[in-house]
Each structure stands twice: as C-alpha cells, then as structure tokens.
Design a protein with these regions (language model features):
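Extracellular/periplasmic, surface-exposed regions of secreted and cell-surface proteins
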Residues: 1-164
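Conserved small/polar residues in nucleotide/adenosyl-binding loops
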Residues: 169-174
Length: 174
C-alpha cells in the first residue's frame, strides 16, 4: 500500500554550560577592615578560556515506512548515528589549592551514539463501529565515549576508565 524512504543529515553546534565561559567570572563580598573601614572584597571564581568553541554534532538518520493490506500492518524503522566532537569538559588535572580556582573547561571530548528504532502496528476494523489496534516498539542505542581526559590512574584500571560505552567501560581499539 505505502512505501516511504527517509534520509537526513545535519550538523549543529551547542555551547554547553555558561554562555560566557570565554570570560573570567568574579565574585564580590566578604568585607574586610582596612583602618577601621569595611571594604568589599573581590575574587576570581573561574578563569575564562578564550579558546573554547562550540561543541559540534554531525547527525545521520535513515528510515523506512511501509504498510500492506490497506494499512492493516505497518512498519516504521530508523537507523541513527551521531558523532559529537569538541565536547566541553573539565581538564583531568590536579592544581594546588593555592591556585584558588578550578580550571576552566576545554574542548576535549568526543563521543558517538548509534541505534535503531522499530515500530510495528496492526489495525483491523471489525464491523462498522469497532476496531482492534496493537502497536509494538523496540529501541536499541549505544553511546561510546571516544575521547576524554584520561590519566594513568584511570587508563590502567579497567574499572575506572572513562572511555568506552556509557553503560560499562572498556577501551576502544582504534
């Protein structure tokens, strides 16, 4: 009865977190006395990173829809793939407490996810006023962190690795 094929590709950007991460952030408060006069204090909360850019995503989707027997049976199936790069992440580095502020985020991570969506429908008219319908769906998706900051402590310990599928961790061979 019906056959429809779909194909899409797109690229998008996302600036995760604050819109002003390229600028330093300052705080005010904690008055101190100088010569008996209370003075307001100011400090740097976070050092800006002027080199950050948008996180980038490339997305691909292929789908098919079809129905037979006047729409009694129909199927919809989709395969999707997404690759994210330049993900904003906090560096995995230790800085001395004397530094006083955390390190700003940098574009360092990448991940991809892929999967399928399936939907099967059954519709049957019984007489003039009755209809039976049933629908089943199935989805499978896999997310894998391809690149993040990895230290020797996490890289050499399979239970603490930061790369690999999100549900469990392993190191991917490239």
């Amino acid at each position: 009865d019906k056959l429809k094929l779909r194909l899409s590709y797109g690229e998008s950007g996302n600036l995760a977190g604050s819109s002003y991460q390229y600028m330093s952030d300052y705080g005010f408060g904690n008055a101190v006395n100088f010569g008996g006069v209370p003075m307001m204090g100011m400090w740097e909360n976070l050092q800006g990173n002027p080199n950050i850019t948008w996180e980038k995503a490339k997305k691909f989707d292929f789908g098919v829809e079809f129905s037979v027997l006047n729409g009694m049976f129909s199927l919809e199936a989709d395969y999707f793939y997404e690759k994210r790069s330049n993900m904003l992440m906090a560096p995995n580095a230790l800085v001395p407490a004397e530094y006083g502020i955390p390190l700003s985020q940098v574009n360092a991570g990448s991940m991809h996810n892929q999967g399928i969506d399936l939907s099967l429908n059954f519709n049957k008219r019984i007489g003039k006023d009755w209809m039976i319908s049933a629908k089943g769906t199935f989805t499978f998706a896999r997310n894998i962190l391809d690149e993040v900051f990895e230290t020797e402590a996490t890289f050499n310990n399979p239970n603490r690795r930061r790369t690999g599928p999100v549900s469990y961790t392993h190191l991917r061979a490239h």
